[in-house]
A protein has these predicted regions:
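N-terminal Lys/Arg-rich, disordered targeting/topogenic segments
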Residues: 1-7
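Extended, histidine- and acidic-residue-enriched regions that form the cofactor-binding/catalytic faces
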Residues: 11, 184, 194-196
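Short, surface-exposed, charged/polar-biased interaction segments
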Residues: 140-142, 184-191
């Protein structure tokens, strides 16, 4: 009888531990769903352009015009990327979507209060879904909402990249690393293309 009781305690402890780890890892996904949508006050919206390109700047302009208050803007690009057509604050960090989003999360975490409450990701239509999901994972635990809420259906190539990148960002939340070092060939190629 004693052995059965101990076994039950171990199973309960494992179940509780697994639940706690699962909740911790999914918390960035859950927070944006249950937290209220912040109202737009001056300076609370930030439109982020991931790597410059005329289409991405045009998307940022459309987003900015659709908001009730003029948003702040930020460009995250590779040093070899296209410079913006107009002066825009820049982060020259990140060599792929995952590392650009983690650079954004780090930058936002160190901004003085009041920080941006909503972040709008401006990128190519095919890239929007993956970029927004990754930004929600990285910024959700900070209570920052990420949009746009509606995006075009991504190509099959983009959909294939979504799950591995989402797992990278979930691991980044847990460990502080996007595990890019585990793929040295891809890492070297991306860094060379980006100029870092």
């Amino acid at each position: 009888m004693l052995f059965g009781h101990k076994r039950r305690q171990v199973l309960v402890a494992l179940l509780l531990g697994t639940s706690a780890v699962g909740m911790w890892l999914t918390w960035p996904w859950i927070v944006p769903l249950v937290s209220p949508v912040p109202t737009s006050i001056a300076g609370s919206d930030l439109v982020v352009v991931l790597d410059g390109g005329s289409g991405r700047f045009a998307a940022a302009d459309r987003m900015g015009h659709a908001l009730p208050q003029r948003p702040q803007r930020l460009l995250i690009r590779c040093p070899r990327g296209t410079p913006p057509p107009q002066p825009t604050p820049e982060l020259l960090q990140g060599f792929d979507t995952a590392t650009q989003v983690t650079a954004l999360a780090h930058w936002l975490r160190h901004q003085p209060s009041p920080r941006s409450a909503r972040v709008w990701i401006a990128t190519d239509p095919d890239h929007t879904a993956r970029a927004v999901v990754l930004a929600r994972i990285a910024l959700g635990s900070q209570g920052i909402r990420v949009g746009p809420a509606d995006w075009p259906t991504p190509s099959s190539a983009e959909r294939r990249r979504l799950l591995p990148d989402a797992l990278r960002l979930t691991l980044w939340q847990a460990t502080g690393s996007t595990v890019a070092r585990l793929f040295p060939g891809a890492l070297a190629r991306k860094r060379a293309d980006c100029g870092v």
